[in-house]
């Protein structure tokens, strides 16, 4: 595989951009409130141990369950998009498991089960709970 696609999902202000910047050294805008609109991307290029060039496509998505409420169609489209094209999907949540996060997990599960046009079958899904902007912040 010459291209690995990694996507991050989660509610607005859950630390999605911050996580991608930390993990991959990207420079997505990160602050409280809405920063990302739609899907932003960054490509990382590197050589593997055999000297072959590889790429990682990093996708930073707009927050779902936004306070600037749209209908749930937007959330479904973002989730289905991520599931259809990604090898790895990271789901961020600021805080403990709650009702909105449960809805996100249900959306992801539905997307995996119901998507027949998926670019890849069965992406790897990771859920990150208690994502804090400052690891020393206990709130």
Regions found by a protein language model. Give the residues of each.
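Conserved GTPase G-domain substructure that encodes guanine base recognition and part of the catalytic core
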Residues: 1-139
